[in-house]
A protein has these predicted regions:
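Canonical BTB/POZ domain core
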Residues: 2-12, 17, 23-99, 103-105
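Intrinsically disordered, low-complexity sequence elements enriched in Ser/Thr/Gly/Pro
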Residues: 20, 48, 111-115
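Intrinsically disordered, low-complexity regulatory segments in eukaryotic proteins
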Residues: 101-119
Length: 119
């Protein structure tokens, strides 16, 4: 199988469908996705030839946005930190794991500051 960086790949992540370039998925070569889409890990496809990933489908959009932009981009009021953290661990994306930890720590500090201010 020829692997090209500009290949557009179709994904089935927990029943949610995504399209992206191979280069996006291999941006972090030591990650699970990097290994999977560089041919180092076996992969399965569904009946529509979409790569099957047994992850949280809705949360994968945040992982994919990180892979595309190298930034943690989340909607205002985002509350699903535990799920996102679990998914980042599952995909073994160390930079994303660190950004999530940093963001969660900032939220904790902000909440503590608000509690202190309220007294």
């Amino acid at each position: 199988m020829d692997l090209h960086e500009d290949d557009v790949l179709e994904l089935n992540v927990g029943g949610c469908f995504y399209s992206t370039n191979r280069s996006t998925l291999t941006r972090y070569p030591d990650s699970m996705l990097g290994a999977m889409f560089s041919g180092r890990l076996p992969s399965k496809v569904d009946q529509c030839n979409r790569y099957i990933i047994d992850g949280d489908g809705p949360t994968f959009r945040h992982v994919l946005n990180f892979l595309r932009r190298s930034k943690l981009i989340l909607p205002d009021g985002f509350k699903e930190w535990d799920i996102l953290s679990i998914e980042a661990d599952f995909y073994q994306i160390e930079d994303l794991i660190r950004l999530i930890e940093k963001a969660r720590e900032q939220i904790r500090r902000d909440e503590e500051r608000e509690r202190t201010r309220a007294y």
